[in-house]
Amino acid sequence: MKSLSYKRIYKSQEYLATLGTIEYRSLFGSYSLTVDDTVFAMVSDGELYLRACEQSAQYCVKHPPVWLTYKKCGRSVTLNYYRVDESLWRNQLKLVRLSKYSLDAALKEKSTRNTRERLKDLPNMSFHLEAILGEVGIKDVRALRILGAKMCWLRLRQQNSLVTEKILFMLEGAIIGIHEAALPVARRQELAEWADSLTPKQEFPAELE
């Protein structure tokens, strides 16, 4: 399996060379890929995983992600990295663009690493919401802000299809520091339309004359 991972690392270095010099090191039994000592991707069992971020949310809507997991004390831990499938490997321009999103988000997080706020200190953040975010690997304010409301909501919805639009509004409010009821009307409508676009519409047979 190591040989497969090394092949994937070398292929990633070739395809993503425009991002800069890509180095790798062992991490969690896998390999982290870095540019300027900033981790933006992982290679595990011969597969490349990109760091999820707000800008990659739309891609993950159209391509339901497979998340990177590893074992810790006998239980599976999910990381915020999604697998690059073969169709994405065949589209190098898109792969480079998504990888750049991941790198930029990682650099942004690195610049704010000196503060590690607790989720429970944010508006709209109930104990239950903090708990379910933790279950999908979102454990602090920095991760919430880097991923953005849409990506966090997608993570929750992938775990539980009954997650409502109200949770999306609560996440957005938590990120910008206001109660969900005080969200600007235009932003609330944009989020609602985005969430609605993900819900399959039920079709009814035409009525007979």
UniProtKB/Swiss-Prot annotation:
Xref: Gene3D superfamilies: 5' to 3' exonuclease, C-terminal subdomain, YgaC/TfoX-N like chaperone
InterPro entries given in the database record: TfoX-like, TfoX-like_gammaprotbact, TfoX_C, TfoX_N
GO BP terms, alphabetized: DNA import into cell involved in transformation; establishment of competence for transformation; positive regulation of type IV pilus biogenesis; regulation of DNA-templated transcription
Deletion consequences: Reduces both natural plasmid transformation and competitive fitness in long-term culture.
Record key words, sorted: Activator, Competence, Transcription, Transcription regulation
Induction comment from the UniProt entry of this chain: Not expressed by conditions that usually induce expression in other bacteria, such as amino acid starvation, antibiotics or addition of chitin. Induces its own transcription by a mechanism that requires CRP, cAMP and CRP-S site in its promoter. Negatively regulated at the post-translational level via degradation by Lon protease.
Pfam families registered for this protein in UniProt: TfoX_C, TfoX_N
Task of the protein: Induces low levels of natural DNA uptake by inducing transcription of the competence genes (the CRP-S regulon) required for DNA transformation. Induction of the CRP-S regulon also requires Sxy-activated promoter (CRP-S), cAMP receptor protein (CRP) and cAMP. Induces CRP-S site-containing genes which are involved in genome maintenance and transcription or encoding transposases and toxin-antitoxin pairs.
Note: Overproduction induces the expression of the competence regulon genes including ppdA, hofB and ssb, although to highly varying degrees. Plasmid-borne expression leads to production of type IV pilin (T4P), the main subunit of the DNA uptake machinery.
Family from the record: Belongs to the Sxy/TfoX family.
Protein's UniProt name: Protein Sxy
Species name: Escherichia coli (strain K12)
